From Swiss-Prot:
Pfam assignment, any one: RRM_1
Record function comment: Involved in the early steps of selenocysteine biosynthesis and tRNA(Sec) charging to the later steps resulting in the cotranslational incorporation of selenocysteine into selenoproteins. Stabilizes the SECISBP2, EEFSEC and tRNA(Sec) complex. May be involved in the methylation of tRNA(Sec). Enhances efficiency of selenoproteins synthesis.
Gene for this chain: TRNAU1AP
Family annotation (InterPro entries): Nucleotide-bd_a/b_plait_sf, RBD_domain_sf, RRM_dom, SECp43_RRM2, TSAP1, TSAP1_C
Assembly description: Component of the tRNA(Sec) complex composed at least of EEFSEC, SECISBP2, SEPHS1, SEPSECS, TRNAU1AP and tRNA(Sec). Found in a complex with tRNA(Sec). Interacts with SEPSECS. Associates with mRNP and/or polysomes. Found in a complex with EEFSEC, SECISBP2, TRNAU1AP and tRNA(Sec).
Superkingdom of the organism of origin: Eukaryota
Stretches assigned to coiled coil: none
Main location: nucleus
KW Thylakoid (keyword) present: no
UniProt protein name: tRNA selenocysteine 1-associated protein 1
GO function terms (MF aspect): RNA binding; tRNA binding
Length: 287
């Protein structure tokens, strides 16, 4: 039975032929491509649905090429793929996730997934977090449907080698309630990753952070789309993912502080009150 994947972040020039060639370049054969357009304007909505021969082929393609550079794209882009539910209810089975740190730049979503699924069959996906330029931030997440396998992976793969050129660091990611942006149409079929938070005990320890000072929030991308009188697409993108070790630009911070201080000073100087000679001086009458 045929199965489809959602593909997003498309440029207007990316038509059906472009998408088919891109998959063929990656060694994948697609049955068809449907570009979604606004019915009123005819303008591409920025996403499409790619049909494969069966579910196994679609899943293999998702894990193999998701996050990899998109051939022929200008400006440079990466494959942004997800499951397409087409009216079916999303899979509400429980998810148990791990944070994976110390990833080298060569590790992508497919490599992260393959590293775990070979030993833990309940692994359902891997996500390497990228910055706005498409470069890995050095960490990612994997999710499981079996809590026992998640716990085994945490213990057995802590410090494991074979994924990139550095030993990996693992800690538990605790799920929060998933959030999908609301849309104004009545029918909405969405596939979304849950959001998680965790305290990076092991990851922070390496860099001298106090693991008891707080928690760090992150989320997988979330995709929602509708099939109604119009097609719409809303996404919480990679920019919703935060760096666990943000760099502080001290010079820029001082500059902003001084600018704000100068604005306050100017406001005080522009007011009509004049300083008194002494504490007991009378306040002058208004003119």
């Amino acid at each position: 039975m045929a199965a489809s994947l959602w593909m997003g972040d498309l440029e207007p020039y990316m038509d059906e032929n472009f998408i088919s060639r891109a998959f063929a370049t990656m060694g994948e054969t697609v049955m068809s491509v449907k570009i979604i357009r606004n019915r009123l304007t005819g303008i591409p909505a920025g996403y499409c649905f790619v049909e494969f021969a069966d579910l196994a082929t679609a899943e293999k393609c998702l894990h193999k090429i998701n996050g990899k550079p998109l051939p022929g794209a200008t400006p440079a882009k990466r494959f942004k793929l997800n499951y397409a539910t087409y009216g079916k209810q999303p899979d509400n089975s429980p998810e148990y996730s791990l944070f994976v740190g110390d990833l080298t730049p060569d590790v992508d979503d497919g490599m992260l997934y393959e590293f775990f699924v070979k030993v833990y069959p309940s692994c359902r996906g891997g996500k390497v977090v990228l910055d706005q330029t498409g470069v890995s931030k050095g960490y990612g997440f994997v999710k499981f449907t079996d809590e026992l396998e998640q716990k085994r992976a945490l213990t057995e793969c802590q410090g494991a080698v074979g994924l990139g050129s550095k030993p990996v660091r693992l800690s538990v990611a605790i799920p929060k309630a998933s959030r999908v942006k609301p849309v104004e149409y009545s029918q909405m079929y969405s596939y979304s990753y849950n959001q998680y938070y965790q305290q990076y005990q092991n990851y922070y320890a390496q860099w001298g952070y106090d693991q008891n000072t707080g928690s760090y929030s992150y989320s997988y991308p979330q995709y929602g789309y509708t099939q109604s009188t119009m097609q719409t697409y809303e996404e919480v993108g990679d920019d919703a993912l935060e760096d666990p070790m943000p760099q502080l630009d001290v010079t820029e911070a001082n500059k902003e502080f001084m600018e704000q201080s100068e604005e306050l000073y100017d406001a005080l100087m522009d007011c009509h009150w004049q300083p008194l000679d002494t504490v007991s001086s009378e306040i002058p009458a208004m003119m």
